[in-house]
């Protein structure tokens, strides 16, 4: 009887061990660990549509890079807007045997724990979308960043807004020679929010648009928060608001929703500009509810991250021609307005059709 119990205990122990590995996200059940790339992806939040679309693209591109010799397992977790929780999720993925980490930081100034844990296990880290401070990224040669130049997005937003305003004098509804504007900012202290805000406004003024600031409001990149902020601003300023600049499309869409609900006729709406090129924003541009966005090329970024992950796993050198300082990959933003909106909507439709056809 004792032998039976011991045998049963061993079997149960083996089963529990297998379950722990499977649930932790990065484990390989095939037993062929030398041919399996385990990629751990950790985002700052599970509620950001752009980040969700980017990680979907990353999974899709990694899937295309599988072969008879190489299997790829992707595990995606969220830090739920808590840096400590994100650190713990990273530790779980490292313990589970991930070979490459892709990290979208909660706090871009606090990557220390993640870098320390990854370095101790010699696991490369590709940070994305939220750029760490340069001093942090340069402290180890297996740290990389994939994203865009926030300054460029601010400049482009200012350019398309200035072009529209200068060719549509009716934007200046009170005909005082100045454009009264509000600005929806991502979050306090976030480098992208700071750069997009600064360069969008500077570029408008550089292009002969006289501005009068009514209000700057933080809405944490969130559509619902932006709608609430805009409702208060509409109550305060009414039709005085002639321009809404938003650090991203989600907040711009919050502004759109506020104006839909308040019941103003379209000529009393301000012109609204966002950044990211989300599908909902593209539809709003087509409908005339927004006047433009800056397309943040998630497809290009996902392709680069997938390529980097496989190359690093294979122990090969990265393509230095595409990297700045050997560590940074920046994809180019693109302007979207009424003149080219169909091109981008068609691209979104083709992408969706392609995903629906995947086995």
Residue positions per predicted region:
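C-terminal motif of bacterial Sec signal peptides marking the signal peptidase cleavage site
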Residues: 22-25
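Flexible loop/hinge segments that line or gate small-molecule binding clefts
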Residues: 114-152, 177, 278-286
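Extracytoplasmic "Venus flytrap"
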Residues: 40-61, 65, 75-88, 98, ...
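Hydrophobic alpha-helical segments within soluble ligand-binding/sensing domains
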Residues: 32, 86, 145-176, 226, ...
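Short, solvent-exposed amphipathic alpha-helices that sit
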Residues: 50-65, 153-157, 191-210, 225, ...
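Hydrophobic alpha-helical
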Residues: 58, 103-120, 125, 200, ...
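Hinge/cleft segment of the Venus flytrap/periplasmic-binding protein
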Residues: 35, 177-188, 192, 203, ...
